[in-house]
């Protein structure tokens, strides 16, 4: 009996430790891709994106090692009320050597509190850096609605007919505003904070298995006292989004219409660039000295239209399919906008529940508003893949691939005084450009991809 009693405190301590470990369990999520590739004409793998487009078809066309490592934990819970702490650190290297150092990007650090407001059951309040309700096309790694960044908000307010979310986030432009109170040029340029205010109404039932989401984003440049924006800067802008999601064929189809103005047109995803101004402006100092400040960003006064349809569906036991079709027109007052349309498919044939063959075919066409000339490219990738499951979304996956790309480009980009590409222009203008001309290339390699 004495032996039993002596063992009791140890047993209690062990049990308490186990229970504590379970209560403090950390959620580990993330994403990663890495591989090796070669180019037919020699050297390491090249990747292909048509000049003027904002994305590329990604299968067999990614030349970097990239990872996002997310750690999170529910740190407090009482009934249906809880606090959750979430973090995300991202890394990207060129996958050229064994030892490749990089500065990590601290992309998320936020706290989310659920059911904390008694009269708004089911809602979540949050603050910090966060990936906020992002909308993207996986096939081309294109985010068309993404206001992520430092911010705060409340989401999923149940209105009965839909759920309302309100948020404010920030994105900052380097060297976007100027002051002339100092003789030191290094004190005269300051980063410009852009504030975005986001309102979304989701879950609106429109038809059987179909829902609608509506959103309005307003973004504006928020300058520090004593600083001002360049003449012609757009200062602010709006973006309106309507997205219909239809559940179908064991997958979904999303149809999206977006319209943006001025500061919201540069990135076209809900983040503002309000200090984009005129190409240059001159100020005279008190001593009579004149200084010309080159504004190394595009004047983005104008508008953007985007019509997008994309999805992922199952076509039977053996076939899955991803697809995308998009038209985007950026019409700027300075005539430096673009018209971009793209269409692509990625069918998957499943030989076994863990082995498949994928074919990705994508075409891009981008027209210069200034000249009317067009750049175009098509890319074809054939890949043999082994994945953890029989879905086109199953990961991890290991694949070997061969890619062929053919392009014909008629225009490039004007370069500023620092030889940095900034403005869309035609090659026949006589100005230095980086148009790729008319050529083709093929690559081959192997890649892993995982999310968890």
Curated annotation (Swiss-Prot):
The record marks 143 as: Important in sugar transport. Residues 1-25 form the signal peptide. GO terms for molecular function: maltodextrin transmembrane transporter activity; maltose transporting porin activity. One of its GO terms (biological process) is monoatomic ion transport. One of its GO terms (cellular component) is pore complex. It is a multi-pass membrane protein. Keywords: Cell outer membrane, Ion transport, Membrane, Porin, Signal, Sugar transport, Transmembrane, Transmembrane beta strand, Transport. It comes from the Bacteria. Induction: By maltose. It catalyses: beta-maltose(in) = beta-maltose(out). It is found in: Cell outer membrane. InterPro entries: G_neg_Bact_CarbUptk_Porin, Maltoporin, Porin_LamB, Porin_LamB_sf. The record marks 31, 66, 99, 252, 393, 451 as: Greasy slide, important in sugar transport. The keyword rRNA-binding does not apply. Homotrimer formed of three 18-stranded antiparallel beta-barrels, containing three independent channels. Belongs to the porin LamB (TC 1.B.3) family. Involved in the transport of maltose and maltodextrins. This is Maltoporin. It comes from Salmonella heidelberg (strain SL476). The gene is lamB.
């Amino acid at each position: 009996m004495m032996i039993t009693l002596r063992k009791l405190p140890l047993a209690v301590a062990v049990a308490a430790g186990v229970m504590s470990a379970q209560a403090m369990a950390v959620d580990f999520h993330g994403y990663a891709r890495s591989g090796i590739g070669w180019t037919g004409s020699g050297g390491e793998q090249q990747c292909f994106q048509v000049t003027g487009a904002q994305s590329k078809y990604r299968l067999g066309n990614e030349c970097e090692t990239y990872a996002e490592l997310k750690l999170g934990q529910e740190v407090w819970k009482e009934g249906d009320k809880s606090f959750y702490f979430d973090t995300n650190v991202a890394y990207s290297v060129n996958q050229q050597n064994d030892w490749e150092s990089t500065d990590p990007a601290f992309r998320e650090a936020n706290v989310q509190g659920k059911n904390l407001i008694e009269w708004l059951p089911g809602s979540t309040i949050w603050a910090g850096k966060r990936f906020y309700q992002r909308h993207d096309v996986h096939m081309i790694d294109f985010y068309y609605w993404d206001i992520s960044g430092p911010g705060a908000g409340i989401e999923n307010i149940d209105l009965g007919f839909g759920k309302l979310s309100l948020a404010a986030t920030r994105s900052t432009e380097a060297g976007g505003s100027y002051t002339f109170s100092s003789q030191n040029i290094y004190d005269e340029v300051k980063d410009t904070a852009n504030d975005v205010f986001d309102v979304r109404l989701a879950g609106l039932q429109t038809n059987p298995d179909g829902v609608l989401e509506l959103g309005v984003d307003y973004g504006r440049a928020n300058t520090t006292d004593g600083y001002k924006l360049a003449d012609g800067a757009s200062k602010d802008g709006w973006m309106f989004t309507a997205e219909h999601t239809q559940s179908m064929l064991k997958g979904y189809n999303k149809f999206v219409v977006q319209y943006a103005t001025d500061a919201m047109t540069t990135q076209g995803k809900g983040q503002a660039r309000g200090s984009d101004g005129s190409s240059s402006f001159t100020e005279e100092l008190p001593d009579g000295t004149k200084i010309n400040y080159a504004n190394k960003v595009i004047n983005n006064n104008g508008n953007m239209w985007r019509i997008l349809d994309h999805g992922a569906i199952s076509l039977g036991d053996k076939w899955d399919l991803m697809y995308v079709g998009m038209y985007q027109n950026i019409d700027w007052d300075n005539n430096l906008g673009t018209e971009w349309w793209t269409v692509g498919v990625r069918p998957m044939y499943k030989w076994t529940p863990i082995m498949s063959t994928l074919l990705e075919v994508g075409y891009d066409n981008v027209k210069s508003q200034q000249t009317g000339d067009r750049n175009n490219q098509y890319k074809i990738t054939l890949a043999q893949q082994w994945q953890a499951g029989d879905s086109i979304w199953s990961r991890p996956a290991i694949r070997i691939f061969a890619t062929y790309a053919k392009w014909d480009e008629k225009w490039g980009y004007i370069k500023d005084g620092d030889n940095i590409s900034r403005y869309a222009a035609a090659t026949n203008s006589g100005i230095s450009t980086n148009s790729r001309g008319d050529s083709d290339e093929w690559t081959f390699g192997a890649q892993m991809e995982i999310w968890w």
